Amino acid sequence: MKTLLILTILAMAITIGTANIQVDPSGQVQWLQQQLVPQLQQPLSQQPQQTFPQPQQTFPHQPQQQVPQPQQPQQPFLQPQQPFPQQPQQPFPQTQQPQQPFPQQPQQPFPQTQQPQQPFPQQPQQPFPQTQQPQQPFPQLQQPQQPFPQPQQQLPQPQQPQQSFPQQQRPFIQPSLQQQLNPCKNILLQQSKPASLVSSLWSIIWPQSDCQVMRQQCCQQLAQIPQQLQCAAIHSVVHSIIMQQQQQQQQQQGIDIFLPLSQHEQVGQGSLVQGQGIIQPQQPAQLEAIRSLVLQTLPSMCNVYVPPECSIMRAPFASIVAGIGGQ
């Protein structure tokens, strides 16, 4: 009801003010403001409550006294401010109520979770002594340590196949290197100058033009071989030449094939002399001389660097070498 009265008073004041402004728009507006402003301030400080019991009497008689009444709604504006702090203050303590169940609920399950802690120590404690039982087979595993000295007895047995190493090296050397270095083998055999009846056969089989072709092929194949395998390649040429001469020697059976040497080399107490015949080394020194002949021929003919490791002839060739000659 108070708000309705205030609104009606405001409406009347606005209509009266607009009527006064329309009557004298030039000078009455300032005059009304000067008179109404102190009048509006006085009832606020002196008697703001006296106007509440007599709002109806002021409508027809005193329109000027009704003008200060529009400022009365300032008091009700302050009144709604009171419920704002009062209303939210009540729910704030209400929100504190749900805080009680939060500590109450988790406190109960925490002691409940402590119950499964009991089976954890009980269960693993029993299997731990059970796992100690497989420690008994460990000494059983120590029993096979006895056959370890037995294979030591077999260790000298693999030393026996070392004698057959040339047989194992043959399939490795022959398909890979000897096939590539067949021209080198042929040129070394051709450079040896046979005598008597065989000389005519060599001249027919290996003409001089083919000799140059084989020399070029030999140098090309030897240059394509990596430096790490050049030593093995030269040894393979030695091996292939020796095997071929052995086969020829078995086939001819009595035909003397003279393989003269271009140089007179002193090897220990013995010597290799031109026209002496097939070289059949029976000492490591003679075998070393044959190897040196091949090492001097191939690198000088093809201008290929030979590593110093090739100066050592391996033992497996000693049982195979029958003889070799060349320039």
Swiss-Prot record:
Belongs to the gliadin/glutenin family. Pfam families: Gliadin (PF13016). Residues 1-19 form the signal peptide. Transmembrane segments: none annotated. SUPFAM superfamilies: Bifunctional inhibitor/lipid-transfer protein/seed storage 2S albumin (SSF47699). Residues 42-81, 128-169 have a biased composition (Low complexity). The gamma-gliadins can be divided into 3 homology classes. Sequence divergence between the classes is due to single-base substitutions and to duplications or deletions within or near direct repeats. This is Gamma-gliadin. One of its GO terms (molecular function) is molecular condensate scaffold activity. InterPro entries: Bifun_inhib/LTP/seed_sf (IPR036312), Bifunc_inhib/LTP/seed_store (IPR016140), Glia_glutenin (IPR001954). Residues 82-91, 100-109, 118-127 have a biased composition (Pro residues). Keywords: Repeat, Seed storage protein, Signal, Storage protein. Residues 42-169 are annotated as: Disordered. Gliadin is the major seed storage protein in wheat. It comes from Triticum aestivum (Wheat). It comes from the Eukaryota.
